[in-house]
Swiss-Prot record:
SUPFAM superfamilies: Aconitase iron-sulfur domain (SSF53732). Catalyzes the isomerization between 2-isopropylmalate and 3-isopropylmalate, via the formation of 2-isopropylmaleate. InterPro entries: 3-IsopropMal_deHydase_lsu, Acnase/IPM_dHydase_lsu_aba_1/3, Acoase/IPM_deHydtase_lsu_aba, Aconitase_4Fe-4S_BS, Aconitase_4Fe-4S_dom, IPM_dehydratase_rel_enz, IPMI_cat. It is an enzyme of class 4 (lyase). HAMAP family: LeuC_type1 (MF_01026). This is 3-isopropylmalate dehydratase large subunit. Pfam families: Aconitase. Heterodimer of LeuC and LeuD. It catalyses: (2R,3S)-3-isopropylmalate = (2S)-2-isopropylmalate. The gene is leuC. [4Fe-4S] cluster binds at C354, C414, C417.
């Protein structure tokens, strides 16, 4: 069925319809054109091998951009990568990009960084686009009104070869967040509260559109944080309709349109809103005024509670599967039911990742750390999401604030978000992290992760236990 027959359409449906090359028939998928393909060193080697074996070129190298992020160290970046597997992946990406004519921002380059930070800051990410990457958190780019999703390695090869992807239409979900956020509550708290409410499978098969006055009041950085973690709710993608905040963020970015092209683009972008009367498959509501700083206690992003709460008791969970999962999580996290979240001591604090490694996040952290010290026995890593973010932070004097406080101010990369580089937890170490996943071993074998906002991360580093800035007064 041709999707263009719909009258009142959601934002996701509009972007989808604009990119259908061939409509699927008899339950076949639609063939969707891809506007931007982001590539990194981990999920691309086999895709390039497939092209090489088939004798195929990259169809649109001009719509493909690569950066090194997952495996790169965040110190001594002028030296060879020590780990042989990481070194091989980075060197392979460099060879593949050179062979196939793909733009690459390597380690040390002024535009190097996490792929989901680099795309937006360069103005490559724009409203109405379809964007893919061999990475779960590609949904970040949906903050601009783009339909952005993570894909597997075989799909990476398909996009490299054809600039298209066969996809079946997704269901749609509206997450309405209305009201005024209380002081000290951020976008990270919104998304953690949502995932706790609907669960890690609540958005399965859906594209989530985040709507409402609280979402509209967020900066682009805040919107990216929320869309970034859509996948942790099981969703295929997350989106926010573009508005003046979006346009101002994009204006004068290196790859943003200019002059008459800007005017034409703006005319299209302004149509990218869900039509009155459009029907979502699912709707969820959150009252922003009732939210507070949020933190996870378990081993998936849905196992979270307000910071002011206590570790939940699995015996009070009715569902057998959820109860068993909670028991297993508490055993791994070495936590007892009833313990106040604010009494949980940490060994490390990590600020960074594609969730919270942007300049706005670093400003929040600096505001908390200024005039204070990281608690004895706590190691704090602050890792900018890109070299451009690092340069801006240095220009604003934030780097000095971090180092004077006793934090480690690093170079750009994925860092301690995942155990694919030297920045890892030791077994049994507990970390408050601004990243997006708290799975067992995510930050290193045996490491224990609590997901938090940048403000909570900074306060936790100072106090030594899970804390909000208000706890420091």
């Amino acid at each position: 069925m041709a999707l263009q027959t719909r009258e009142a359409r959601t934002l996701a449906e509009k972007v989808w319809d604009d990119h259908v090359v061939v409509s699927g028939r008899n339950e076949a998928p639609d063939l969707i054109y891809i506007d931007l393909h982001l590539v990194h060193e981990v999920t691309s080697p086999q895709a390039f091998d497939g092209l090489r074996l088939a004798g195929r070129p990259v169809r649109r190298p001009d719509l493909t951009i690569a950066t090194e992020d997952h495996n790169v160290p965040t110190v001594d970046i002028d030296k060879p990568i020590a780990d042989p597997v990481s070194r091989t992946q980075v060197e392979t990406l460099r060879r593949n990009c050179a062979e196939f004519g793909i733009r690459l921002h390597p380690m040390g380059d002024v535009e190097q960084g996490i792929v989901h930070v680099v795309g937006p800051q360069l103005g490559l990410t724009q409203p109405g686009m379809t964007i893919v990457c061999g990475d779960s958190h590609t949904s970040t780019h949906g903050a601009f009104g783009a339909l952005a999703m993570g894909i597997g390695t075989s799909e990476v090869e398909h996009v490299l070869a054809t600039q298209t992807l066969p996809l079946r239409p997704f269901k749609t979900m509206a997450v309405n967040v209305d009201g005024r956020l209380p002081a000290g509550v951020s976008a990270k708290d919104i998304i953690l509260a949502l995932i706790a409410k609907i669960g890690t499978g609540g958005g399965q098969g859906h594209v989530i559109e985040y709507r409402g006055s609280a979402i509209e009041s967020l900066s682009m950085e805040g919107r990216m944080t929320i869309c970034n973690m859509s996948i942790e709710a099981g969703a295929r993608a997350g989106m926010v309709a573009p508005d003046e905040t979006t346009y101002e963020y994009l204006r004068n970015r290196p790859h943003a349109p200019t002059g008459a092209q800007w005017d034409a683009a703006l005319g299209y972008w302004q149509q990218l809103r869900t039509d009155p009367g459009a029907v979502f498959d699912t709707e969820v509501h959150l009252d922003a005024a009732e939210l507070s700083p949020f933190v996870t206690w378990g081993t998936n992003p849905g196992q979270g509670v307000p910071l002011c709460a206590t570790v939940p008791d699995p015996e009070l969970i009715g569902d057998d599967g959820e109860r068993q999962a909670a028991e297993k999580a508490l055993a791994y996290m070495d936590l007892e039911p009833g313990k106040a979240m604010r009494d949980i001591a940490v060994d490390a604090v990590f600020v960074g990742s594609c969730t919270n490694g942007r300049i706005e996040d670093l400003r929040v952290v600096a505001e908390v750390l200024r005039g204070r010290k990281v608690a004895p026995g706590v190691r704090m890593l602050i890792v900018p999401g890109s070299m451009r973010v690092r340069a801006q932070a240095e220009k604003e004097g934030l780097g000095e604030v971090f180092t004077v406080a006793g934090a480690e101010w690093r170079q750009a990369g994925c860092s301690m978000c995942l155990g694919m580089n030297p920045d890892q937890l030791a077994p049994g170490e507990r970390c408050a992290a601004t990243s997006n996943r708290n799975f067992e071993g995510r930050q290193g074998k045996g490491g224990r992760t609590h997901l938090v906002s940048p403000a909570v991360a900074a306060a936790t580093a100072v106090r030594g236990t899970l804390s909000a800035p208000a706890d420091l007064n």
